[in-house]
Amino acid sequence: MELKDFMDLSKLQKIQNAFSDATGLAAIAVGKNGEYITEGSNFTDFCMKYTRNSTEGNRRCVKCDNECTGTYYCHAGLMDFAIDIMLNGEKVGAVIGGQVLPKDPDEEKFRQVARELSIDEDEYIEALKKVNVRSEEGINASAFLLGDALNNCMDAGYNETYNGRLMQRIKDGIAECKGLMENIEGNTNQLNAIQSQQKMLALN
């Protein structure tokens, strides 16, 4: 089962965009195999233009995306989140994001990260200054609220799809039974006609 099988992706994109606009957090939805299924909302230059644009930075980012859950500090020092979207106990996708600071940054630590990733330090710090600062409590609450909302949408979409398919199977079953009954009736009429002919021949 895949998230996109039971949820309207355009609706998912609107929810994601509204979440990012309201909270200042970045967000994007991924399928169960990690592929992006929506466009990123509120992504920062710090992450996309600099960190992920370096070979080592991208390797570390992908590792975080694939291995981290809940809310966590990414390798570059920002706070991110990854919330699983579940259906009947099975993971069908996730929403990941964050790209915010829980407090004012220590510039020297980020300069060290820039050196490790072979990124221009001054440009990195300028991009860092544009990153939103949110309390850790607010980040946690926002991430899990989005997760709950998407899981509820997922359940509703699944139920709608399942019930629709169930009704279609019932209709198909009724049509099949009707066709079968018509065939039986037709065969019965043929048998009756044959029996009548045989009786007439027997009388002659």
Where are these regions (language model features)?
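A short, charged helix-loop
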Residues: 115-126
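Sensory/regulatory domains in signal-transduction proteins
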Residues: 62-115, 130-153
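Signal-transducing coiled-coil/dimerization helices and immediately adjacent hinge/linker segments
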Residues: 130-204
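Structured interaction and signal-relay segments at domain junctions
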Residues: 1-77, 204
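Alpha-helix boundary/capping detector
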Residues: 45-46, 60, 115, 172-179
